[in-house]
């Protein structure tokens, strides 16, 4: 089976999780603006959480209860979302009032062989850094 990791018996990410200050605003942004679909939700108040399907079965898990004093755990830098049209995806983000930190840019990843991609970055509703990633 293509893409199957024989060492752990699977492959790919199931989900990436983040804790946010404004749960409702974050869920609204990822569902209404980016088109993610709610799969399961649980908890109440600052214990709320939800899984949002990004479109291919992998999910963004959003937890309530974040604060400005909350220190990030681990070393994640950003989350990258696959798109077929980086420019159109970023237009949706701009229309929603999000801060764009890098306009769509063509780059050549210096791999062997070199890999051409188009990328853009923005800040989500809770300040998280999100990348749109388009294979060319």
Model-inferred region functions:
Residues 12, 48, 75, 118:
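Beta-rich catalytic cores
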Residues 79, 86-87, 98:
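Mid-chain, well-packed structural core segment of small domains
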């Amino acid at each position: 089976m293509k893409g199957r990791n024989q060492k752990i018996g699977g492959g790919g990410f199931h989900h990436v999780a983040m804790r946010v200050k404004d749960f409702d605003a974050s869920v609204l942004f990822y569902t209404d603006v980016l088109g993610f679909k709610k799969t399961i939700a649980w908890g109440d108040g600052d214990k709320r959480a939800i899984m949002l399907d990004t479109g291919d079965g992998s999910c963004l898990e959003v937890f309530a209860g974040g604060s400005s004093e909350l220190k990030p755990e681990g070393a994640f830098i950003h989350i990258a979302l696959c798109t077929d049209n980086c420019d159109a995806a970023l237009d949706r983000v701009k229309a929603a009032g999000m801060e764009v930190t890098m306009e769509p840019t063509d780059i050549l990843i210096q791999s062997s062989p070199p890999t051409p991609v188009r990328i853009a970055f923005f800040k989500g509703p809770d300040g998280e850094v999100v990348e749109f990633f388009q294979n060319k």
